[in-house]
């Protein structure tokens, strides 16, 4: 029996890529998984994929830059699993769209909001 059995992990940006890989690995160790992601279609696919693997998963559509979305995710996670044991702040964006020289203040603000404020929200 794993030390992670029946523990609950929240993973932001969990619907694909590194986040989904982390969710899969943790779920295979017996953890309950809560995926938070802005992309609801990809989130539904990830939920179905993890469920097929026998992982107990809850997907919550959210924007990491919105504090109320974090609160909703936490409320739903606790309602479903009773407690949150681990948080993986995985959501992030590589850069603003387009060339750096053409990046305006609004685009840089978006990068900072997701990559920095999303972690401390």
What are these regions (language model features)?
Residues 2-34:
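Canonical Rossmann dinucleotide-binding motif of NAD(H)/NADP(H)-dependent dehydrogenases/reductases
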Residues 5, 53-56, 76-87, 107:
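A glycine-rich helix->loop->beta "capping" turn
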Residues 12-21, 42, 47, 59-64:
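A structural preference for long, well-packed, hydrophobic secondary-structure segments
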Residues 29-45:
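Conserved glycine-rich Rossmann-like NAD(P)H-binding loop of the short-chain dehydrogenase/reductase
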Residues 40-41, 61-72, 105:
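The beta1-alpha1 cofactor-binding region of Rossmann-like NAD(H)/NADP(H)-dependent oxidoreductases
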Residues 91-96:
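Conserved NAD(P)H cofactor-binding loop of Rossmann-fold oxidoreductase domains
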Residues 98-100, 107-110:
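Substrate-binding pocket helix/loop in short-chain dehydrogenase/reductase
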């Amino acid at each position: 029996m794993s030390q992670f059995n029946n523990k609950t992990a929240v993973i932001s940006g969990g619907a694909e890529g590194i986040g989904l890989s982390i969710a899969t690995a943790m779920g295979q160790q017996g953890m309950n998984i809560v995926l938070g992601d802005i992309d609801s279609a990809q989130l539904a696919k990830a939920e179905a994929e993890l469920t097929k693997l026998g992982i107990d998963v809850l997907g919550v559509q959210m924007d990491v830059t919105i504090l109320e979305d974090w609160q909703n995710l936490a409320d739903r996670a606790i309602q479903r699993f009773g407690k949150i044991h681990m948080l993986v702040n995985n959501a992030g964006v590589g850069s603003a769209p387009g060339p750096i020289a053409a990046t305006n203040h609004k685009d840089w603000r978006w990068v900072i909001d997701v990559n920095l404020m999303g972690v401390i929200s």
